[in-house]
């Protein structure tokens, strides 16, 4: 561990088009090989598609989707006396958002639609309706935490 303590949290910049830090965070998660313009085009096209399909504010749709994906519990491995236990722990708000974004992007990449913008748009729309692979991932995480509830007293 560093002697100077943890690195300070940097503020997330707001997005120039939508004025939302969530959108700029999503752009950063989509980013590959430093091609930020490509990532921005993907996200903006996906959000415009959400607006066209739902006739609602795309940032609100994204927020609703992320709220449906955010996990409240997860399991962490803890070694006690030669045995490794999966200990359920609560997830901090910043990590909830990070995990939700990561799952949204990863499961978007696995979808079968033609372009990444289409995949992202459909995953956002599915998640905002409580469907999709990313919401299933959250449910699986919660089930795992519930199944290992007996080891909750090993929390640190």
From Swiss-Prot:
On whether Ribosomal protein is a keyword of this UniProt record, the answer is yes
Its cellular-component GO annotations read: small ribosomal subunit
Query: Could you tell me which species this protein originates from?
Result: Cutibacterium acnes (strain DSM 16379 / KPA171202) (Propionibacterium acnes)
Do you know which PROSITE patterns this protein is assigned to? RIBOSOMAL_S7 (PS00052)
What InterPro entries does the entry give? Answer: Ribosomal_uS7 (IPR000235), Ribosomal_uS7_bac/org-type (IPR005717), Ribosomal_uS7_CS (IPR020606), Ribosomal_uS7_dom (IPR023798), Ribosomal_uS7_dom_sf (IPR036823)
PANTHER family for the chain: RIBOSOMAL PROTEIN S7
Q: Name one GO biological process term.
A: translation
* Physiological role: One of the primary rRNA binding proteins, it binds directly to 16S rRNA where it nucleates assembly of the head domain of the 30S subunit. Is located at the subunit interface close to the decoding center, probably blocks exit of the E-site tRNA.
Q: What's the subunit arrangement here?
A: Part of the 30S ribosomal subunit. Contacts proteins S9 and S11.
Q: Which family, according to UniProt?
A: Belongs to the universal ribosomal protein uS7 family.
**Listed Pfam families:** Ribosomal_S7 (PF00177)
Report what the protein is called: Small ribosomal subunit protein uS7
Give the keywords, sorted. Ribonucleoprotein, Ribosomal protein, RNA-binding, rRNA-binding, tRNA-binding
Gene Ontology MF terms in the entry? rRNA binding; structural constituent of ribosome; tRNA binding
